[in-house]
Amino acid sequence: MFTAKDFKTRRCNFLSIDGVLPVRAKTAIFNDYIYTRVLDLEMQSPPRNAALMKDQKESGPQYIAFQGDFGEKRGYYGYLGFTTFNRFFGGVSLSENGEFSACAYLDFEEIRPGDVIRTDNCCFYAQYGNKDVLSIYGKHIAKDNRAYPKAGVPSGWCSWYYYGGKVTQESILENMEILKREKLPVKYIQIDAGWQVRNGDWEENSKFPMGMKALAADIKEAGFIPGIWIAPFHFEKESKPVKEHGNDWFVRNDDGEVDPSYLIDYSVKEAREWLFELGRKISVEWGYRYIKVDLISGYLAINGYKKHGFNGLNNFCTMMRTLRSAVTEDTMLLSCTSPLGALAGYADCLRVSDDIFEKWSSLKIVAKQVLRRYFTAEYIRLDPDCLMVRLPSQHDSEAFRFCTRNEREIRTFVTFMSAAGGTLMLSDKLSLLDRKAFDLIKVLFPLNEKPAKPLDFFERDIPSVLSYGEHKGVEVYALFNWEDVQEVREINFKGPKYLKLFYANKIVRADGKFALEMSAHDSEIVYAANDAESFEVLTTSILP
């Protein structure tokens, strides 16, 4: 807490607390800053793994994890990070010699004499020998925000990665019928961007002639739960809110003009009432019980709000609180392009990565982000984005994204989705898939409900050896080769083990260590047990 005394009114950019921790950090795990108007940790923030040289310092939004020495003791793992997100976005820095900074970004807020500035909680934690320190960090966030994931993993089909903005009522109904025919055990049919008149005018366009309420009723009648996409921070110039309330609801720049990006100010009561009615209409009146909330961080103004002391973080939290209060209790909220920590306690699901896109290279980027952010599952259900299993030959003129991944890369994509332990949303045109593709999808059921833990978190840029823990008396591991050349992946055991390889469909024996030579872009699921008879619980699915 800081009180402005003997202080002239001024705009301040940050408030920093500096000190020295009793650590010598050898490796740092953190995220780079990206420009999204506000300095927050969000899904597109690039994860980093850096070996620290003498006196080297690294900085990032929200947290830094480290490996190093604690005083005279070696082999410690720890973190420095914010655990509450009520007042300001925050960042931290840590040097090899233990010097640290914890910074609250005031975003040029006007500070007046007598103002009391309260920052959020920032925590330092270290433990010996256990690399899984970020799970402790996730638990601290969960406790401090009273935020815990709901039971069950949302699964379904999403229109975005095949149809994009060209989605139609017919394409929704067609894919729904195929899901019924294939008896895939998924729940949600999510209509992504392309259904609305324009961003800001959330009514159906001419491609949805029956209307969104009637379409939701058809989806429910077919045995699914209807889902929909909205962007409550993005307003097009021709939208009604801009035309009718442009001077009142939107942030002004330093020149006193409305920002040309039309950045909404939810400190304005009438703007909140508009949002509440939108949420009520979509959830209560139309019947959608899964709402994807998108386009957030890039449209959060730093300052310029009508309410003194209101900032981008407050604007985001106000939006989420308002929307949550408007929808039914059983409505799932998925937040995309949003702050990763500040969402704790507001939404049910959180996108933790970039868009998956259509190439192998984009899958690697997403895998790095998702597998390094497994700790978010302690306070929310993580979303690793959609799964696409289509080959280059399985497209037609409606395709928005032309996928170029080959069969091996698609299988690795499926393995990754299992290891991620988050939501599972399919995003192909299902009528173009063959039996082999559907069989590959089905290996994911029953769904993995918790992220597999990376065993090489501090050693590799993209985690490649992950443990699911024990399922029905069998240890389960996922191995990945993200590289473009053949490489070896190893698992160490405390004693002899029998191993079964899922894709290779063979049983081998390992005496303390198992090494698998893997082709480029390949993956494998490995089961370990004390005797081969334990593998009788295994089926054609990844998890027993």
Where are these regions (language model features)?
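Carbohydrate-binding surface patches
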Residues: 58-60, 413, 417-420, 425, ...
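Solvent-exposed beta-strand/loop surfaces of large extracellular or lumenal domains
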Residues: 90-99, 500-516
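Intrinsically disordered, low-complexity Pro/Gly/Ser/Thr-rich segments with frequent PxxP/GP/PP motifs
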Residues: 108-113, 510-525, 529
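Conserved, mostly hydrophobic/aromatic
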Residues: 114, 157, 189, 219, ...
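Glycan-recognition surfaces
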Residues: 241-270, 277, 318-433
